[in-house]
């Protein structure tokens, strides 16, 4: 006996767990009571229907792009004192330039995200990395405060896809019950790219001079551009909203998924048990099809060479570009978007405080550390970020599934937010250790420990906020990310300005 869900319009509320195995929809293969949200189509070009190997290969290159993109914009921080001595640009002005970069890293998404949503993820990533490579090379030759500010503004705009596009690609490739894990991986690559790069660039600045930081990063950017062009496939796929969700069940149907087992006949004969569609196991190990008739794929898979093109991905069925570019401002009316923006805004603000003050604190008495040792302090951040990502990636999905089972199989976007309580404790403790501890000139171990505690909360807040938007505003998630980033990076500029 099978049933089909009846929808009701609560954004983000979906039937995630088929507690009695009666829904006539596609399920996961490893956990066969997990309903696939969104439901994959029969089109072979649908990224949701790709094999696990193909998905992993593509997301790996996206994360590689993100890691080195974050590295390119973060490599200078250990060398601020050297840059000041060489160019006359003060550390305060360098910090202000860093703040301007983060401001336009957010506002630049109005351009780059709109381009990616209309013309494709692949051309956006390739064009962005090409431009970042040349701007990074230019940075080695800046000679004045004004030129440095312009340089930082431009690199902020062209590198902005790392802020909002990676989340959209995760949405293209993965189902609701898998997104938390990959959001955690994304947070790790983003923050560790920003933190590991200064570890290396501190030694580069000490041995070769600060300009070699930009030379080496430009070479890396060129290599990443070529690899992205060769190996990353386009993931943009038009999916009508009416076909994407298995939404929550109304109250009158909750008995089908609650504890009242007498409401349905759960006994099935062997020939009535759900069977995967023909070829399903060989096509995609993430998908099991239950009691669905076999369909003939009328769409043909793209030719191999067509996957290399950087044009022709626009779909006429999508909304107009002008209207789409204004949506991020419209979404600022919603409290959930404002909440997500303030959450990640507070996190980035404190990251800017750390990035702008670490060299000043550790390069002066009583510590007097060189650029190489200052760079090593970012290893504390890497440890903290890794712990935070482990919590946010694994626990986020596990918690949402567990909460859904407790609520008759229905998942709400707010179920993931319980993990934020960890950040509420760790973040203020880390800030006190780092800031107040430095003012009292405590041992450097205490400062490193405070840095690690602050860093634990970076992926927690980022992953929770963006996954919350993705779950709540599925059809407008790309624009919702832009809305949150506008709030976040505007807040970060205020914290980055010298007092």
Where on the chain are the PLM-derived regions?
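Cytoplasmic helix-loop-helix junction between adjacent transmembrane helices
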Residues: 153-190
């Amino acid at each position: 006996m099978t049933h089909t869900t009846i929808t009701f319009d609560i954004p983000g509320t979906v039937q995630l767990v088929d507690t009695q195995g009666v829904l006539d929809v596609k399920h996961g293969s490893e956990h066969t009571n997990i309903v696939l949200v969104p439901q994959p189509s029969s089109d072979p070009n649908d990224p949701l229907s790709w094999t696990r190997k193909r998905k992993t290969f593509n997301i790996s290159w996206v994360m590689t792009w993100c890691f080195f993109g974050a590295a390119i914009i973060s490599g200078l921080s250990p060398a601020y004192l050297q840059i000041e001595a060489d160019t006359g640009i003060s550390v305060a002005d360098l910090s202000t330039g860093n703040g301007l970069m983060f401001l336009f890293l957010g506002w630049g998404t109005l351009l780059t995200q709109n381009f990616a949503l209309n013309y494709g993820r692949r051309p956006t990533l390739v064009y962005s990395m090409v431009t970042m490579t040349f701007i990074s090379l230019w940075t080695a030759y800046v000679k004045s405060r004004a030129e440095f500010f312009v340089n930082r503004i431009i690199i902020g705009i062209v590198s902005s896809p790392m802020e909002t596009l990676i989340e959209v690609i995760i949405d293209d490739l993965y189902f609701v019950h898998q997104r938390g894990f990959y959001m955690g991986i994304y947070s790790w690559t983003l923050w560790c790219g920003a933190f590991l790069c200064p570890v290396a660039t501190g030694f580069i600045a000490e041995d070769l001079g600060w300009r070699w930081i930009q030379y080496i990063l430009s070479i890396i950017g060129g290599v990443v551009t070529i690899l992205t062009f060769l190996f990353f496939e386009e993931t943009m796929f038009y999916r009508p909203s009416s076909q994407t969700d298995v939404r929550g069940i109304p109250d009158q149907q909750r008995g089908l998924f609650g504890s009242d087992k007498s409401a349905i006949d759960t006994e099935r004969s062997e020939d009535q048990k759900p069977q995967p569609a023909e070829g399903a196991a060989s096509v995609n190990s993430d998908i099991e099809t239950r009691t669905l008739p076999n369909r003939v794929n009328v769409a043909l898979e793209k030719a191999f060479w067509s996957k290399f093109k950087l044009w022709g991905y626009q779909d006429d069925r999508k909304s107009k570009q002008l209207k789409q570019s204004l949506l991020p401002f419209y979404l600022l009316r919603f409290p959930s978007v404002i909440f997500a923006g303030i959450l990640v805004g507070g996190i980035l603000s404190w990251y800017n405080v750390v990035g702008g003050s670490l060299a000043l604190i550790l390069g002066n008495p009583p510590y007097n550390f060189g650029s190489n040792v200052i760079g090593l302090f970012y290893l504390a951040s890497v440890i903290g970020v890794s712990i935070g990502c482990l919590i946010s990636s694994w626990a986020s999905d596990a918690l949402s599934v567990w909460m859904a089972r407790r609520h008759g199989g229905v998942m709400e976007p707010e179920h993931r937010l319980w993990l934020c309580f960890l950040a509420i404790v760790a973040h203020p403790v880390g800030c006190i250790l780092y800031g107040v501890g430095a003012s009292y000139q405590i041992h450097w171990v205490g400062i490193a420990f405070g840095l690690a505690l602050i860093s634990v909360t970076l992926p927690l807040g980022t992953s929770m906020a963006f996954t919350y938007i993705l779950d709540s505003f599925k059809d407008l998630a790309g624009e919702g990310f832009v809305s949150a980033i506008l709030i976040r990076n505007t807040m970060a500029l205020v914290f980055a300005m010298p007092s």
